[in-house]
Amino acid sequence: MGSIDEVKKESAGETLGRLLKGEIKDEELKKLIKFQFEKRLQWGYKSSHQEQLSFNLDFIKSLKKMEMSGEIETMNKETYELPSEFLEAVFGKTVKQSMCYFKHESATIDEAEEAAHELYCERAQIKDGQTVLDIGCGQGGLVLYIARKYKKCHVTGLTNSKAQVNYLLKQAEKLGLTNVDAILADVTQYESDKTYDRLLMIEAIEHMKNLQLFMKKLSTWMTEESLLFVDHVCHKTFAHFFEAVDEDDWYSGFIFPPGCATILAANSLLYFQDDVSVVDHWVVNGMHMARSVDIWRKALDKNMEAAKEILLPGLGGSHEAVNGVVTHIRTFCMGGYEQFSMNDGDEWMVAQLLFKKK
């Protein structure tokens, strides 16, 4: 009997209430989360190829009628402004908050972070002496990796988080890197006449909606010789917004505020080639993401008391608020494991595409 049949009927509010009170043990939480993703699969898979294609094309067409981005400011405040000391306690040495790449079973999180950065550089065809723009650069791990490995490159990170800009510039100074810049801006509002040899976007395009407008904007920062490398989480067959699939879906809205995240299909970006054209296309098995989030959760659990102490001052000394943040992050990690390990990593995964300017 599958988990859909095993989960007792309960309203979304009741489930969230129990979760935030600490009344749901991990084993039950795993079942509750898996139940939501099984419902998503039932929602997304259609009975015939024709119906599936029509469903997918309707989604693509709907994106082209939307604003360029989702609720970026909401996402920024709720997810990306955590203290750097907290992030360092949970993530690996480069504080990478996206998929890490495990070359072998015994790989550590630090090795997997570096392997992911290496993979990006290989597939984006990074070469020494290039100008590189990392859009949605996070804490700047990839920016710093490129700046250290390719010393003649000039690498710029763009983020709408002041905390991330400060962290990146501080790390660059510590490492004595003079080939690093950071831009504080919302990419959808940022205007520049500057062009770059390579544009990178790692797990950030998920916060965009109208990809036709967005890819057009990115193309203005490219020359005829430039390449754009995009890495995004995806489902292998269908796209969906990370929003409630029905009224009993407590999970989706808890993890991401409504309107903040779009999960594309593995081939969705192929429908947005008005201003760029695809050069290459890969997928990475979801187990790499599943292992990443599982290691993050274990690190949080191991450093729980210290992590809570770090969070406390920024949350007005409220232990309830601290518990809320920690519960959110643990649930995100547990959910990510269930999502990306489904069907041995062959349902939700990571797509990578390389584009040139048209």
Curated annotation (Swiss-Prot):
The active site is at C333. It is found in: Cytoplasm. InterPro entries: SAM-dependent_MTases_sf. GO terms for molecular function: (S)-tetrahydroprotoberberine N-methyltransferase activity. It catalyses: (S)-stylopine + S-adenosyl-L-methionine = (S)-cis-N-methylstylopine + S-adenosyl-L-homocysteine; (S)-tetrahydropalmatine + S-adenosyl-L-methionine = (S)-cis-N-methyltetrahydropalmatine + S-adenosyl-L-homocysteine. CDD domains: AdoMet_MTases. S-adenosyl-L-methionine binds at S98, G136, N160, Q164, D186, V187, I202. Induction: Up-regulated by elicitor treatment. Transmembrane segments: none annotated. Pathway: Alkaloid biosynthesis. One of its GO terms (cellular component) is cytoplasm. Keywords: Cytoplasm, Methyltransferase, S-adenosyl-L-methionine, Transferase. One of its GO terms (biological process) is methylation. Its EC number is 2.1.1.-. Pfam families: CMAS. Homodimer. Belongs to the CFA/CMAS family. N-methyltransferase with a strict substrate specificity for (R,S)-tetrahydropalmatine or (R,S)-stylopine. This is (S)-tetrahydroprotoberberine N-methyltransferase 1. The lineage of its organism: Eukaryota, Viridiplantae, Streptophyta, Embryophyta, Tracheophyta. The gene is TNMT1.
